A protein has these predicted regions:
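Terminus-proximal functional modules
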Residues: 1-70, 75-82
Length: 82
C-alpha cells in the first residue's frame, strides 16, 4: 500500500493517508491507515501538521471517497516533506 496526499479545494488544508503497521505483533500486518491532517499557509513552505489518527482501512477508504466528492484533489506537491 502506498501513501496518498489530498489537498482541499481552496488549497488551505491537507490530509495524508498512509499505511499503519502494528509494531507489537511479531510479523507486522497492515490492517489500518494513519490519517494525518494539517494546514497549508504558503505553497512553497512545509505544511503545518496538526495531528493524526488511526482508522480501519474501510473507514479510511470511506473518508477518502467523501473528500474526493467534496472537491479535494490528490497531490504530490508535498511528498518531499513526508
Amino acid at each position: 500500500m502506498e501513501k496518498f496526499t489530498l489537498i482541499s479545494k481552496d488549497r488551505s488544508r491537507i490530509k495524508v493517508f498512509e499505511p499503519f503497521e502494528g509494531v507489537s505483533k511479531p510479523s507486522p500486518r497492515i490492517d489500518a491507515m494513519m490519517i494525518s491532517y494539517g494546514c497549508v499557509y504558503k505553497r512553497n513552505s512545509k505544511p503545518v501538521m496538526k495531528g493524526s489518527r488511526v482508522e480501519t482501512i474501510e473507514a479510511a477508504r470511506k473518508e477518502y471517497a467523501e473528500l474526493l466528492k467534496e472537491g479535494w484533489k490528490k497531490t504530490s506537491i508535498f511528498r518531499s516533506y513526508f
